[in-house]
Each structure stands twice: as structure tokens, then as C-alpha cells.
């Protein structure tokens, strides 16, 4: 919140029962492959309930927050969830709090892309700063991050960014300039969707086969291919 220059009226540590942390929002391959969101836990998933900070914001501050995340028509989807204060988890009669949170409209899954070390350090740092439970901090510490493990992939990263960064980055500038009141103009959203689809198509069909993936590590890719061949 500090980096967005927002002043919440109140903050509490909270857990969202039945929801898990996911990195299923595609970003910029090779550089910032994924951003986080939350979604309901699927059957068989063992990830812990997501823990975070619940902020009490004014209507104006909330709209500013939405704008900073791409607006209502951006990649995020507003969802209504119920959370419990961490301090009251042992109290079965503790009241739940109704909150707004952000999920993703078009998740990239099977597999989900991995977050960068920079992005993951922000999440881990926030968990440490707010003194989240040690078990949850350990869970975050063990989540994998995207790494470039070969010179071939590094060459692919440089070439990919030379082509796509000058196209993608101005879109975020347009969102900041025209996304007033938490709403992004339709023509910017239209442009963003098509540019990102084209960018990820180029990654999946051209750059990844030639240079290695820009969203998962080579080790994870090998494991997925092995499982696929065995199935």
C-alpha cells in the first residue's frame, strides 16, 4: 500500500478459508512471467488457505487500487470472499468479514507460469514484515521461481524483450493515463488482450521451442514432458 501512496483506514491479518494463492496471471515471458491471484481450492490440492492483509479503504481509495491493477476491465476479476482475522482463528464463533479480492479472468494453467525472483521476494518480504505464521512463510519460501538456466534461454530472453517490451510497456502507460475511476477504456482493453495473446503465442510457438521456456524452469518442463509421455 505504501508504494501506491494509499492510507488504509484499518488493516488486519486475515485468512481466506477455501482459497489458495496462485500465479496464474500471465505477464511478460522471460522477465515477469506471472502475477499472483487467488482462487477456490480444487479437490486434491493441499496448498494452505491463503493469508493476507485485509484493508479498510474509502471508495475513492479502492477505485485507485483497482486502477493500479489495470482497472475493472483489466486482467483481474473482482470477487467477493469471506475472511477470518488470524487473531481469532482459534475462536469457532469468530465473525467472518466480507471482503473484495482479485482473481483472474483468463488464468494460464497446466502448468501455471512461475513468478520471478523479484516478484516473489515482494510477497515473501510482505509476509515477513506482517509477521505471518511461520508455517505459511515456510510455504512461501518453498514455492518455485522462474530461473534462466542456460545461455540459450538467456539469448531468447534478450531477443524476446527487444521485440515485445517496446510493444507491451506502453500499454501499461495508457492504462495509467486513461484508466480513471478504476475503469479502463474499452479500446485499451481491446488492445491489451490482443497484444498479450500475440505475445504469448509467439512465446509458445516460436521462442519456447527454440530457446527454452520463458514461463517455467527447464527442470519443470522436463518433468511435465515425462509425465505427459507416461500418461
Where are these regions (language model features)?
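Glycine-aromatic micro-motifs
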Residues: 1-231
Amino acid at each position: 500500500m505504501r508504494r501506491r501512496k494509499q492510507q488504509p483506514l484499518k488493516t488486519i491479518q486475515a485468512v481466506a478459508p477455501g482459497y489458495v494463492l496462485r500465479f496464474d496471471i500471465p505477464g511478460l515471458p522471460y522477465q515477469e512471467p506471472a502475477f499472483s491471484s487467488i482462487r477456490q481450492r480444487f479437490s486434491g490440492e493441499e496448498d494452505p488457505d491463503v493469508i493476507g492483509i485485509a484493508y479498510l479503504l474509502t471508495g475513492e481509495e479502492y477505485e485507485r487500487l483497482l486502477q493500479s491493477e489495470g482497472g475493472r476491465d483489466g486482467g483481474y476479476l473482482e470477487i467477493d470472499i469471506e475472511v477470518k482475522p488470524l487473531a481469532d482463528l482459534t475462536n469457532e464463533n469468530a465473525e467472518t468479514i466480507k471482503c473484495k479480492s482479485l482473481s483472474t479472468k483468463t488464468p494460464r494453467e497446466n502448468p501455471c507460469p512461475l513468478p520471478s525472483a523479484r516478484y516473489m521476494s515482494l510477497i515473501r518480504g510482505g509476509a515477513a514484515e506482517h509477521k505471518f505464521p511461520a508455517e505459511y512463510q515456510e510455504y512461501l519460501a518453498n514455492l518455485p521461481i522462474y530461473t534462466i538456466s542456460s545461455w540459450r534461454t538467456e539469448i531468447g530472453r534478450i531477443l524476446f524483450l527487444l521485440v515485445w517490451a517496446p510493444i507491451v510497456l506502453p500499454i501499461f502507460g495508457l492504462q495509467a493515463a486513461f484508466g480513471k475511476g478504476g475503469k479502463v477504456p474499452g479500446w485499451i482493453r481491446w488492445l491489451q488482450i490482443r497484444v498479450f495473446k500475440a505475445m504469448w503465442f509467439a512465446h509458445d510457438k516460436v521462442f519456447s521451442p527454440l530457446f527454452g521456456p520463458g514461463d517455467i524452469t527447464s527442470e519443470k518442463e522436463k518433468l511435465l514432458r515425462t509425465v505427459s509421455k507416461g500418461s
